[in-house]
Amino acid sequence: MPPQMNPQISETLQPRPEDYAYDLDQALGAVVSVTTIVPEDAFTADILGTERAGSGVLIRSDGVVLTIGYLVTEAETVWLGLSDGRTVPGHVLGYDQTTGFGLVQALARVDLPALKIGQSSSVEPGASVVLAGAGGRSGAVAARVIGKQEFAGYWEYLLDEAIFTAPAHPQWGGAALIGPAGDLIGIGSLRLEQSSEGEDEHLNMIVPIDLLPPILEDLLTVGRPNRPPRPWLGVYAVEIDDNVV
């Protein structure tokens, strides 16, 4: 099994239980590490690597884990590191390229509480949240929602209302965004940089959890959503010397 990640979160960024109205440690206990091995000849191997590591979160008591899809796409081997110290094998249930969500089934009894799925639409900019990777408090960042807006990726990816949080989590892939009520409101996808008043600020882009319920049953049963693919126009533009090419 490849080595699991070490988040290395500064204590000054870690959440404190007294700052939240829910049981922080119980919520963090649902977050797991996700480690995968992908064949060298896989389509995504050159871009994403053959050994991948990130996080996921238990969303059902039977061991279903929600994560970000790029960790598990084309994976042949999956390991889940649980909050009680156990490491169990997993199996990829499904992946949705449109949202970026991936599902993994633990292949052993988990016996840990799942994190309740919340409503990302109810969370506004300024809300106090926790972006949690595996490892309990030492793997989590106390953050705030700094924006909700459209996000478009050049790899044919579009979210109508992505969530942006700061400060940034250094191990963002598959991290659980825990809302003010202690429920799951999103999954970490990217780390971005923006300039504000002459200074660079790092933030995370989160896939909102409201995109999951409409496709969850399809992911569980057939591995992908039962819907037509989104059409894309094949144009790629960049700015060079104040001109668009």
Predicted regions and their residues:
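PDZ/PDZ-like domain segments forming the peptide/carboxylate-binding groove
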Residues: 55, 167-171, 175-176, 236-245
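C-terminal cap/linker of serine protease catalytic domains
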Residues: 1-24, 184-245
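Gly/Ser-enriched beta-turn/beta-hairpin loop segments
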Residues: 41-49, 93-100, 148-163, 195-198, ...
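Conserved active-site neighborhood of the chymotrypsin/trypsin-like protease fold
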Residues: 7-12, 39-41, 53, 58-140, ...
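Short, glycine-anchored, charge-dense loop/turn motifs used at functional sites
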Residues: 32, 62-64, 180-184
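Structured segments of extracytoplasmic/periplasmic soluble domains
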Residues: 81, 132, 148, 215-222
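Active-site loop architecture of trypsin-fold serine endopeptidases
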Residues: 46, 75-77, 112, 133-144, ...
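A short, Trp-centered hydrophobic/proline-enriched beta-strand micro-motif
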Residues: 26-43, 131
